[in-house]
Amino acid sequence: MCDIMEIKKFIETIKGTKLFTAYNTNVDAIKYLKDEDVQKLVDEFNHKDIIERMEEYPRIIEEPLDFVARLVHSIKTGKPAEVPIKDDKKLHEWFDRIKYDEERMGGQAGIVSNLMATLQIDKIIVYTPFLSKKQAEMFVDYDNLLYPLVENGNLVLKKVREAYRDDPIKINRIFEFKKGLKFKLNGEEITAKQSTRFIVASRPEALRIEIKDDVRKFLPKIGEAVDCAFLSGYQAIKEEYRDGKTAKYYFERAEEDIKLLKKNKNIKTHLEFASISNIEIRKMVVDYILSNVESVGMDETEIANVLHILGYDELSNNILKDSFIEDVIEGAKILLDKFKNLEVVQVHTIYYILFVCRADNPLSKEELEECLEFSTILASTKAKLGNIRAIDDLHEGLKIPHNKYGDLLKEIAEKFNDNNYKIALSPSRYVEKPKSTVGLGDTISSGAFVYYVSLLNKKRMS
């Protein structure tokens, strides 16, 4: 199939789909790190203090040393990470003195909404609790991208850019680095194993991951208006707030949100997992959200973290240590066995994207692979160009070949297909030095999920 026809087929498949996304959008301030940037950062501190703090592995950034220690750890291991920052004026001022290279849309709901609007699916309804003018302007200017408001007691869908309020702005600082970046720490030369990113995530006290009551009562109506929902941002929930509300309160509301969305129409829902440093919050995402959705997307570290919560410590540690595909597939099967609500577990890594389903899934293995192939093209396009601004950009992603391990990975995955499970794998189209890695996982997951729902709908209608 020629490139133009292949892209046309993919876009034609998804064009009738309607999507709801929530909850997290923010402004990403991005710094593309060079060798000298990191060297300058580590030289601000005693190198032995950095090493000691790395061993302590801080789960919240309370001072600049915590940040430098976790950044170095991320570079050294080649693993992406997201760590919340304490809401402290002096600490924010320290980060503000860094010269960032650009600002762009951040947050899974924001990134996915912009992508799907650009790909011209039929309708996207996005909800985020904060929508300042600056945030609203970071959404792409398309008529298919809408925000739910209540006016005179009625649900109204407005273009996102016209729906802004006088809300605070949530800013995440993103530190991107490329494979091969080098610096010295205490006499040791450290080299970045992979191109990835480290996120310093702000958690403003005023930000609550919830749908406000006025819109919330219309969730059954919103659910009726869409085919599927892509849900994310739960990592921003705090254990406790100054007004006495707790994580349990917000997770109970979030669980109810899913039920309300499905009240009038049995839509497909997807949880996009994330790097969650707080183990209690991670457990609540599993207990309240994972147990209520049909689809979940995660990377290998995230599936390992979920398996740890479920008590599979040895398998979890093996995945964290070696990332063998056999262990990842075994972990995905465990999730399907534990959570009967799940139809599909999707795992994305640098080298592949994987679907693990039960054998009775209505889509064939070839159709599942088609979903994954579409998502790899989206990912390679975004990695190469930094962003997807038009459908024609996908031709750039399609030019990038699958990585050299593709045949071996497909061969291994094929061995796990049996009477109980259906497994599909697509090797990634590997961009050696990506322009940007932020949002790659969200791009992969949303592409695969929306395509999956589109094929299910077509199958049902035929």
Swiss-Prot record:
Highest taxon listed in the record's lineage: Archaea
Alphabetical UniProt keywords: Cytoplasm, Glycolysis, Kinase, Magnesium, Metal-binding, Multifunctional enzyme, Transferase
Associated pathway: Carbohydrate degradation; glycolysis
GO CC list: cytoplasm
NCBIfam families: P_fruct_ADP
Functional note: Catalyzes the phosphorylation of fructose 6-phosphate and D-glucose to fructose 1,6-bisphosphate and D-glucose 6-phosphate, respectively, using ADP as the phosphate donor.
Oligomeric and partner information: Monomer.
The protein's name in its UniProt record: Bifunctional ADP-specific glucokinase/phosphofructokinase
Species per Swiss-Prot/TrEMBL record: Methanocaldococcus jannaschii (strain ATCC 43067 / DSM 2661 / JAL-1 / JCM 10045 / NBRC 100440) (Methanococcus jannaschii)
Gene designation: pfkC
